[in-house]
Amino acid sequence: MKLIDAPRCPYCARARIVVAEKGIEIERVEVDLSNRPQWLVDLNPPRGRVPVLDNGFTLPESEVIMAYFEERYPEPALLPDDLTERARARLLLYRFDENLGDDYYAFRRGDDNDLVGKLESLEVGQSLFADIAYVPWVIRARDMLGVELPARIADWLANLEERPSIAAEVELVRSL
């Protein structure tokens, strides 16, 4: 089983964190997105986006990979046991772009927006699954874009950084 991955990519970070949380043995194949290889475009057409799981079949998209790993490797569980809470966690992931993604990328491009306000309004700490979906962007906002995190979000991130999977992602981001 291979995970096609790019260190800078927060979507890939989701998959890396889940792999670490679940202790999955996997071969990571790192690609340089500024020089995207043709084999990646062929594997995941039309643009060759990452992450991609190659396990005898091709599975793109971080949300789908996260869900696949959660079902394939049920322990330790990242989703809550309660059906309603699991649905809420999935809803947070479904609404990612609306809740954070669009504003993060606009801020990164230099557009005037309220990224700090979006960060402040995040619903975090309810589900590790949803937290894993959001934390790569929060780490990058702080460590790559120099955003001062709202106190509640900084505290949430500090708690998550105690997890080896998140600490490893912070270390990776700081090395870029």
Question: Where are these predicted regions, by residue range?
Answer:
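Short, solvent-exposed turn/loop segments enriched in Gly/Ser/Thr/Pro and often Arg
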Residues: 32, 129, 173
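GST-like domain detector, emphasizing the conserved glutathione-binding G-site
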Residues: 1-123
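Phosphate-coordinating loops and pocket residues in cytosolic domains that bind phosphorylated ligands
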Residues: 42, 162, 171
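GST-like fold's C-terminal all-alpha helical module
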Residues: 84, 92-165
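Terminal-tail/helix-coil boundary detector
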Residues: 169-176
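A local structural micro-motif
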Residues: 27, 150, 168-169
